[in-house]
Amino acid sequence: MFENFTEEVVDVAGAPTFVRHGGAGPAVVLLHGHPRTSATWHRVAPQLVSAGFTVVCPDLRGYGRSAKPAPTADHSAHSKRAAAADVAGLMTALGHESFDLVGHDRGSYVALRLAMDHPARVRRLALLDCIPISEHLARVNAEFATRWFHWFFFAQSGTPERVITADPDAWYSGDPAVMGQENYDEFRTATRDPAVVRGMLEDYRAGLTVDRALEESDRAAGAMLRMPLLALWSLRDDLEELYGDPLAIWRDWAVDVRGHGIDSGHHMAEEAPSELAAALTEFLSPAS
């Protein structure tokens, strides 16, 4: 897994950040979602290296082997702004002033915040299986609350930690035949770590509070993404079923939007890596 990649922990303003990086050429950052680590990209990253990119895959703060800051009352220590600053600082440390940026699931919210906060650094932005948090919350109904109940369960204080850490393997399921054994082993190690569980829950708590407020402030100010945006979603997940065309939502946030569905379940990097890598390579090529 990640043959010929370097694995290291980089200190980013006091936040230890675990990262895998390899290849040569324009830099592209891949940000994982919940409850995964950077290992989720193990089938996509080598294909992007072969296509001529430097590929950087960090563990987000609170996840995997990266920093586990103490929770704060306002959840700002686990905000997407804080996580985005980690990624921006990591790329500076690795010598990349500008880069392409890809995020999946919770990593998409970090990528969106990074593109909003540091637009000059992001050449192209690809967001997988997401619409903005504030757009989800503006559309909450019984169907969303039933399917995505974990958003609201995770927001509760204390109870989710007790429930999940009592039997993490039951809460977080995975199939090594689909994920790949090494990816699965890393995922299982992470989800059995109470510090990781707390960090992941704080990610969701920040989402409903400080992250939502930042997005709503962006919209009130008329902020728009100016870099090209690719939105991809899993056809066997429920984003399209819940909201129709996700591109219609993203056009309120970005001036240059394109995208399509991919025949996959939610974890497309593991389930449809070649199709995903092809879509990213086409989008990230200089002529796109």
Question: What annotation goes with each model-predicted range?
Answer:
Residues S264-P273, A277:
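Catalytic histidine-centered segment of alpha/beta-hydrolase-like enzymes
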Residues A15, R36, E275:
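Residue-level recognition of oxygen-bearing side chains
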Residues A39-V55:
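Short amphipathic alpha-helix adjacent to the substrate-entry channel of hydrolases
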Residues G25, G33-R36:
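Active-site glycine-rich loops that stabilize anionic/oxyanionic intermediates
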